[in-house]
Design a protein with these regions (language model features):
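ATP/NTP phosphate-donor binding region
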Residues: 1-85, 302
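A glycine/threonine-rich phosphate-anchoring loop and its flanking beta-alpha core
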Residues: 23, 104-188, 193, 272-275
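A short, small-residue-rich loop immediately preceding and capping a beta-strand
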Residues: 79-102, 106-117, 239
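Short glycine/serine/threonine-rich phosphate/pyrophosphate-binding segments
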Residues: 18-21, 41-45, 69-70, 94-101, ...
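Acidic, glycine-rich active-site loops and adjacent beta-strand->loop/helix elements
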Residues: 66, 92-94, 102, 115-119, ...
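Active-site segments that bind and position negatively charged phosphate/pyrophosphate groups
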Residues: 180-288
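C-terminal charged capping/lid subdomain of soluble metabolic enzymes
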Residues: 279-343
Length: 343
C-alpha cells in the first residue's frame, strides 16, 4: 500500500524566467510581498527587487542556517508590522525555510526563487532550531504556491556550495528510492534525479559558468525535491536534522553522511541499491556516492565539519529514540557506530 498527497505548487522553469516574476504574481493576485532572504545582498536579490517593483512590502533579511527560533520570532514581528499578502523567499534553504516557519504561524502563500539545489521549495517540510535541538515536520500550508527556477541565478554559486548543495539534493533522491511504503512514482522520479545529478554536478564543478550544466543540475534538484515530498524521510534525513542542532553545516553534512547511511541500509534494500548504483553508473551505490564526493572535492568527514566525539552519544541516543521509517532498524548502537565511522 502507498498513499500520495501532493501540494498545489505552480513551477516556472527555465533560463530567464525571473523576468516573469511580476506577471506570475499578478496572475496569483499577489500585490504586497515581504522579501525573505539572508543578510547578504547580491545581484540575484537586486534582480528580485527589480522584478517585484511596487509589489515590495518590505524586506526581512535575517534568514540563517537551520532556521533559529529567535529569527522566526523576529520575522513574525516584521510580518505583523508590514502586513504583506505573500512571502517571497529568495535564496537557498535558509531563506525558504524561514518563509515556511512564518507560514506555519501566519496563513500567507509563499513564492520561492531558489538559488541553490537544496530543494525546500518543492516540499511541505519545515524545520526550526531551538538551542541544540532541530524540530521538523510536514504541513501542507508551508508548501510554496509558486516556484520560479531560473538557472541563470545559480551561475554565481561558488564551486564548493554548488557541490555540497548538489549532494544535498542527491540525498533527497537516494533516500526516496528505498523509503518504506513510498509510491512507485517517488522511486521513478528519484531515479531520474540521481541520474541527472550524477551527470550534471561533475560538469558544474569543471565549468561552473556553463548554463546548460547549471540547467541540468537544477532540473535534477527539482526532481529530487519532488521525490522527497512523495516519500517519507528515513535515517539519513533524521541524522542530518539531529546534527543540525549541533550547528553542523546542512549541505556538507548530507554529503558526508550519505555514503555511510547507504552502506548501512544496503543489506535491507538490495533492489533499490541496484537501481541507485545503475543511475550513478557504478556497481555499488555507496562506493559510487563516495566517488562522486571525491570528484566534487567533498572529502570532509563529520569531524572536520565540527562534530565532536562527545556529541556522538547524544546524537545516537536522539536518533535511536526517534520513530521514522527506514529499511533497516536504526538502534542507538547502530547509529553510534555509523557516526564513529563517519567522523
Amino acid at each position: 500500500m502507498f498513499i500520495v498527497e501532493w501540494s498545489r505548487t505552480r513551477v516556472v522553469f527555465g533560463a530567464g524566467t525571473l523576468e516573469r516574476l511580476g506577471t506570475e504574481l499578478d496572475t496569483l493576485g499577489l500585490a504586497r510581498c515581504l522579501l525573505v532572504t539572508t543578510p547578504r545582498r547580491d545581484a540575484t536579490i537586486a534582480s528580485v527587487l527589480a522584478g517585484l517593483g511596487d509589489r515590495l512590502a518590505g524586506v526581512c533579511d535575517i534568514a540563517a542556517m537551520h532556521v533559529p527560533s529567535d529569527r522566526v520570532q523576529r520575522a513574525l514581528a516584521e510580518v505583523d508590522r508590514v502586513r504583506p499578502d505573500a512571502l517571497l523567499a529568495a535564496g537557498g534553504g535558509s531563506a525558504i525555510g524561514l518563509a515556511k516557519a512564518i507560514a506555519r504561524e501566519r496563513p500567507l502563500p509563499i513564492v520561492a526563487v531558489p538559488t541553490t539545489y537544496a530543494g525546500s521549495e518543492m516540499t511541505s517540510i519545515w524545520g526550526i532550531t531551538s538551542g541544540d535541538t532541530k524540530t521538523t515536520g510536514r504541513n501542507p500550508a508551508v508548501a510554496p504556491r509558486l516556484v520560479i527556477y531560473d538557472p541563470v541565478l545559480t551561475l554565481s554559486l561558488p564551486a564548493h556550495t554548488s557541490a555540497a548543495s548538489g549532494m544535498n539534493a542527491m540525498a533527497h533522491a537516494v533516500e526516496a528510492m528505498y523509503a518504506p511504503d513510498a509510491s512507485p512514482m517517488a522511486a521513478a522520479v528519484a531515479e531520474d534525479a540521481i541520474r541527472t545529478l550524477a551527470r550534471a554536478l561533475p560538469s558544474v564543478a569543471v565549468t561552473p559558468r556553463d548554463l546548460d550544466a547549471r540547467t541540468l543540475a537544477l532540473r535534477g534538484a527539482h526532481a529530487a525535491a519532488m521525490a522527497l515530498e512523495l516519500a517519507p524521510m528515513g535515517l539519513h534525513h533524521k541524522l542530518c536534522h539531529v546534527l543540525g542542532g549541533f550547528g553542523l553545516p546542512h549541505a556538507e553534512t548530507h554529503a558526508a553522511l550519505l555514503p555511510h547511511v547507504v552502506a548501512f541500509n544496503a543489506p535491507a534494500a538490495p533492489e533499490a541499491m541496484a537501481r541507485i548504483a545503475g543511475a550513478l553508473g557504478t556497481n555499488d551505490a555507496a562506493s559510487g556516492l563516495r566517488a562522486l564526493n571525491d570528484i566534487l572535492g567533498l572529502t570532509m568527514s563529520l569531524g572536520t565539519l565540527g562534530l565532536k566525539q562527545a556529541d556522538v552519544e547524544r546524537a545516537a541516543s536522539a536518533v535511536g529514540a526517534a520513530t521514522f521509517p527506514n529499511p533497516r532498524a536504526a538502534t542507538a548502537d547502530a547509529v553510534r557506530q555509523l557516526l564513529v565511522d563517519a567522523l
